[in-house]
Amino acid sequence: MDKSKQPFRKSKRSFRRRLPPIGSGDRIDYRNMSLIGRFISEQGKILSRRVNRLTLKQQRLITIAIKQARILSPLPFLNNEKQFERTESLPRITGTRTIKK
């Protein structure tokens, strides 16, 4: 078969296997805030399994640990820093009413 008539073939690229985000020595626990913090978005949402590159079992354990940490309050439910920022407010207008006699 000529090279010109061969079907399209993708070139084989060597890929480097990514290291797993959870090491063998890491304990998945609600008190391990440094580990849990890696799997939460900036808004405080739990990241998906595809984003985290976790196995199904690891994702389940991480989700349970995050929910326990939220309930026991080392971790907030929402992560809104804007809520605490002070904005300049307009001056209040009081006493503009006049009494007619």
Swiss-Prot record:
It is found in: Plastid, Chloroplast. The gene is rps18. The keyword Ribosomal protein applies. It comes from the Eukaryota. NCBIfam families: S18. Part of the 30S ribosomal subunit. Belongs to the bacterial ribosomal protein bS18 family. One of its GO terms (molecular function) is structural constituent of ribosome. This is Small ribosomal subunit protein bS18c. InterPro entries: Ribosomal_bS18, Ribosomal_bS18_CS, Ribosomal_bS18_sf. Keywords: Chloroplast, Plastid, Ribonucleoprotein, Ribosomal protein, RNA-binding, rRNA-binding. Pfam families: Ribosomal_S18 (PF01084). PROSITE patterns: RIBOSOMAL_S18 (PS00057). Gene3D superfamilies: Ribosomal protein S18. Residues 1-24 are annotated as: Disordered. One of its GO terms (biological process) is translation. One of its GO terms (cellular component) is chloroplast. Residues 1-19 have a biased composition (Basic residues). The lineage of its organism: Eukaryota, Viridiplantae, Streptophyta, Embryophyta, Tracheophyta.
